[in-house]
Design a protein with these regions (language model features):
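N-terminal catalytic cores of secreted or lumenal carbohydrate-active enzymes
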Residues: 1-64, 68-82, 88-89
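Catalytic-core region of carbohydrate-active enzymes that cleave or remodel glycosidic bonds
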Residues: 55-58, 62-65, 83-88, 92-168
Length: 168
C-alpha cells in the first residue's frame, strides 16, 4: 500500500508522496495497475500471500487494477493452477511469460484462439524466442499477429528483447 501511496499520493498529506516529491517528482504518477507476483510457484503459500495483498489493495485503492501471475511457463501445473486460482479470486488480468524456440511459436499460433473471454484478461508480460536468427524474428512476428487477432483476450504484451540495456 505504501508503494501506491508513494506513486499516487498528495505530498501535502502523505509521508510517502512527500518522499517522492522530495526526490524530485512532485506530481503523482497516476499509477493505474500493479503486478503482484512474477513466475511464482502457485502453491498454498503463494495463494495466501497474494490474496492478502490483493484484498488490501482492492480495499484501499479500488480503482487500481491488480495484475496476477500464472507461473513461469505457458503450460504445466503452475500455469493451470495459476489460471484456476485467478478465476476463483477474481483477478482481472494475469501476466504470462514465455521464452520458447521458433518452432514452438509457429506451432502455437492458436495459443490464445480459445482463451476464456469471460475470465481474466491476459498480459503476455515477457516473451521471446531463444535465438537471434531471422527465423526467430519471423516466429515472434507471426505470434504477435495472432495476439492482435485475440486482442479481446490478450490486452497487453511486452516483448522481452526490448528490455535490453541500450548499447549492451
Amino acid at each position: 500500500l505504501d508503494l501506491v501511496e508513494w506513486a499516487n499520493g498528495d505530498p501535502a498529506t502523505s509521508k510517502w508522496a512527500k518522499m517522492r516529491a522530495d526526490a524530485g517528482h512532485p506530481a503523482p504518477f497516476n499509477l493505474k495497475m500493479i503486478g503482484i507476483g512474477n513466475e511464482d510457484l502457485i502453491d498454498p503459500v503463494f495463494k495466501n500471500r497474494f490474496q492478502q495483498i490483493f484484498d488490501a489493495i482492492k480495499a484501499a485503492y479500488p480503482d487500481i487494477v491488480v495484475v496476477g501471475t500464472v507461473g513461469p511457463a505457458p503450460s504445466g501445473q503452475d500455469y493451470e493452477e495459476g489460471w484456476k486460482y485467478a478465476r476463483e479470486a477474481g483477478v482481472p488480468i494475469v501476466d504470462e511469460h514465455s521464452y520458447q524456440s521458433s518452432s514452438w511459436w509457429f506451432h502455437n499460433l492458436d495459443h490464445y484462439d480459445n482463451a476464456d473471454r469471460k475470465g481474466p484478461k491476459i498480459y503476455l508480460g515477457e516473451y521471446g524466442s531463444w535465438n537471434t536468427q531471422l527465423i526467430n524474428g519471423l516466429s515472434e512476428a507471426a505470434f504477435m499477429g495472432r495476439m492482435e487477432l485475440n486482442g479481446d483476450a490478450v490486452v497487453m504484451s511486452s516483448y522481452a528483447p526490448l528490455f535490453a540495456k541500450n548499447g549492451h
